[in-house]
Regions:
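Intrinsically disordered, low-complexity linker/terminal regions across diverse proteins
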Residues: 1-37
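Long, Lys/Arg- and hydrophobic-enriched amphipathic alpha-helices
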Residues: 24-184
Length: 184
């Protein structure tokens, strides 16, 4: 069943919907125990399906970068962020950004079902390091020593395990016959 958000008194709460959502659940997850929360994003699935088809027809490669997981997981990742802090998504609606983690494993399966080459899904920090972010940051810092601390801080935000380096993932797709992607 779909989870719905409904008003309850002065706040909002999640409740089970009345309509089955079997068509939206990825095939690999249809045998989950009743009551298991399985997040799906039909919009992301449709986008990857379309991009994979275009890559096969027109050639090329695509990168998808966002926070999420590269293995199938159950449970809710819904969160609200206001002023860089996590807040209750059901309090003061409209005053926070709502978000959920990307299910890269399902998106990779969709792309491969269209004949697309999956280059991999790796943590952003590893991908950037494989592409040479450390050397680039060092070169920038040497060229502008007055900005060396800011450059190092910006690099650490992108690659640090406690920052964006592990939470954010990079998924690469390419047309068949395309060489392996750099960074993967």
């Amino acid at each position: 069943r779909e989870r719905m958000v409904v008003p309850e008194g002065e706040r909002f709460v999640c409740v089970a919907g009345t309509q089955p959502m079997d068509a939206a659940v990825p095939e690999a997850r249809r045998k989950a125990e009743p009551g298991t929360i399985i997040e799906t994003c039909p919009g992301a699935a449709a986008t990857v399906y379309e991009v994979a088809g275009r890559l096969n027809e027109q050639g090329g490669a695509a990168l998808f970068i966002d926070y999420g997981h590269d293995t199938v997981r159950d449970g809710s990742t819904l969160q609200a962020v206001r002023d860089h802090l996590k807040v209750d998504p059901f309090v003061n609606p409209g005053e926070a950004d709502l978000t959920a983690h990307v299910d890269f494993a399902t998106l990779a399966t969709i792309a491969q079902s269209r004949g697309c080459k999956w280059l991999g899904t790796v943590p952003q920090g590893r991908w950037l390091r494989n592409l040479g972010i450390d050397a680039r940051a060092q070169t920038l810092a040497q060229a502008a020593p007055q900005h060396a601390q800011a450059i190092e801080a910006a690099k650490e935000r992108l690659v640090g395990e406690g920052q964006m380096g592990l939470l954010f993932k990079v998924m690469g797709l390419a047309c068949p016959g395309w060489p392996g992607g750099a960074g993967f």
